[in-house]
């Protein structure tokens, strides 16, 4: 669903040009930065997984498909094609970064405008219709929401720009030119609320509880459950929370975290490493709260979380999806973590809070054990970092026509417990239905003989 803007490529530029709507692949779902450069290392042999029960998921992004899924006929047609292609589960996005929702809520506003696309009040429950039609086709359903975004700075749309409810609660960015509220920064894809604030967390838990209570589905996926990037949040509230975390006063704010040099590069301060640990612990603790809330309402609903596979860049977003048992500073790639990783950073790992981690191997090549931009490399790394703390599925982006989606689907199913393809808009635009089916069928035929 989010990043630190080291990975600024927008995955579905073609959708913007063709449909003049916001990109399906917003900050949360995008291509990797140059940061993760592998050193030569061992080449783990692929470990076959049992085929029974493996989930093959297709993501239905709310923004990129806003017009397409404005009618029931449009939804039905795509669910039929999804089933025919071999998928057995869908992900339905019901809270895009714009902040309004696509389910029946007692306190959230219905999404009728995203970017330049306007959809009249449907008069029917978008999420319930998806659920009813998916169940008719024996498709499982994951419901996904962005967690902390509440508006789009590029268009100034969303709850963050209406009224005063969220005044002073969106992230305060520390940039080379000074402090800038994220909702006033059109370069950012989403106006994030500050995850540090208790009232923000309570609000997010409220809509999560509402969805889990009122709908019958299989899993809940957290998207954009993170900080926007390294520039956020530097509000007074975050300063006070950080001081409580370290048990002392920060004399120079924000300079004791970092400053900028003349080139706009970060220069670490004395609390640099502790700062990233603090922010990751905020996200860890929130994910743990979400799990507790969901399981208290419906114990069988699984908690899922999507994040990019390039773990070494995600400290800037507070996303430590690794196991607590993983020790970054003794890993083979420790050389690339030393500059920011504290001795206790491993304690912020939240893999053990998840039922399923959706590993964002949104990478251009399938094979290459020493290629940091290959799915194989991303899966090998995840095995080291997750240490069986949770089930995980490899997930792929098929926005590029030249991407070998057939081989990617086959390999992801062979190596991990499941598959997620992002996003249906790419599958449609690139006509990848047949190739996906070939990849799924090849894996299942092979697995049936093992």
Say what each PLM segment does.
Residues 20-52:
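Bacterial Sec-dependent N-terminal signal peptides
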Residues 50-69, 142-214, 261-272:
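Active-site-adjacent "subsite" loops/lids of carbohydrate-active enzymes
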Residues 73-100, 215, 346-357, 415-418:
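Catalytic domains of carbohydrate-active enzymes, especially glycoside hydrolases
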Residues 87-122:
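Aromatic-lined carbohydrate-binding/catalytic grooves of carbohydrate-active enzymes
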Residues 87-94, 126-184, 221-226, 299-304:
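Glycine-rich, aromatic-flanked loop segments that form ligand/cofactor-binding clefts
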Residues 102-114, 149-186, 224-263, 316-329:
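Aromatic- and acidic-residue-enriched segments that line the glycan-binding/catalytic groove
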Residues 151-153, 230, 297, 302-367, ...:
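Substrate-binding cleft/loops of secretory-pathway carbohydrate-active enzymes
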Residues 337-450:
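Substrate-binding cleft of secreted/luminal carbohydrate-active enzymes
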């Amino acid at each position: 669903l989010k990043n630190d803007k080291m990975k600024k490529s927008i995955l579905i530029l073609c959708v913007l040009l063709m449909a003049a709507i916001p990109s399906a692949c917003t900050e949360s779902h995008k291509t990797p930065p140059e940061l993760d450069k592998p050193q030569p290392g061992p080449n783990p042999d692929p470990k076959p997984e049992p085929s029974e029960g493996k989930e093959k998921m297709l993501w239905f992004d709310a923004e990129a498909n806003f017009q397409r899924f404005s009618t029931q006929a449009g939804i039905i047609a795509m669910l039929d094609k999804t089933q025919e292609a071999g998928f057995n589960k869908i992900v339905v996005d019901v809270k895009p970064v714009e902040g309004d929702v696509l389910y029946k809520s007692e306190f959230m506003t219905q999404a009728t405008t995203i970017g330049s696309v306007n959809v009249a009040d449907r008069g029917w429950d978008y999420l319930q219709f998806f659920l009813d039609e998916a169940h008719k086709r024996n498709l499982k359903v994951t419901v996904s929401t962005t967690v902390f975004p509440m508006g789009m700075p590029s268009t100034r749309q969303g709850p963050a720009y209406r009224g005063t409810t969220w005044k002073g609660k969106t992230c305060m960015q520390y940039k080379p030119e000074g402090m800038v509220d994220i909702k006033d920064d059109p370069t950012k894809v989403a106006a994030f609320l500050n995850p540090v604030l208790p009232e923000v967390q309570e609000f997010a838990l409220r809509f999560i509880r509402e969805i889990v209570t009122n709908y019958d589905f299989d899993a809940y996926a957290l998207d954009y459950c993170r900080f926007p990037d390294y520039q956020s949040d530097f509000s007074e509230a975050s300063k006070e929370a950080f001081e409580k975390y370290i048990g002392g006063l920060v004399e120079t704010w924000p300079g004791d975290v970092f400053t900028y040099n003349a080139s706009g590069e970060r220069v670490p301060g004395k609390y640099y490493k502790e700062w990233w640990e603090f922010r990751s612990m905020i996200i860890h603790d929130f994910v743990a709260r979400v799990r507790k809330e969901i399981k208290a309402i419906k114990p069988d609903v699984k908690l899922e979380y999507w994040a990019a596979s390039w773990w070494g860049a995600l400290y800037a977003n507070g996303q430590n999806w690794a196991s607590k048992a993983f020790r970054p500073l003794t890993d083979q790639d420790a050389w690339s973590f030393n500059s920011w990783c504290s001795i206790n950073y491993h304690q912020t790992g939240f893999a053990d809070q998840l039922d399923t981690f959706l590993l964002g191997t949104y990478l251009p090549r399938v094979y290459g054990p020493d290629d940091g931009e290959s799915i194989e490399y991303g899966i090998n790394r995840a095995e080291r970092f997750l240490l069986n703390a949770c089930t995980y599925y490899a997930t792929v982006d098929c926005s590029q026509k030249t991407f070998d989606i057939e081989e990617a689907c086959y390999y992801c199913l062979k190596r991990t417990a499941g598959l997620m393809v992002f996003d249906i808009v790419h599958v449609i635009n690139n006509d990848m239905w047949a190739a996906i089916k070939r990849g799924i069928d090849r894996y299942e035929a092979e697995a049936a003989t093992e």
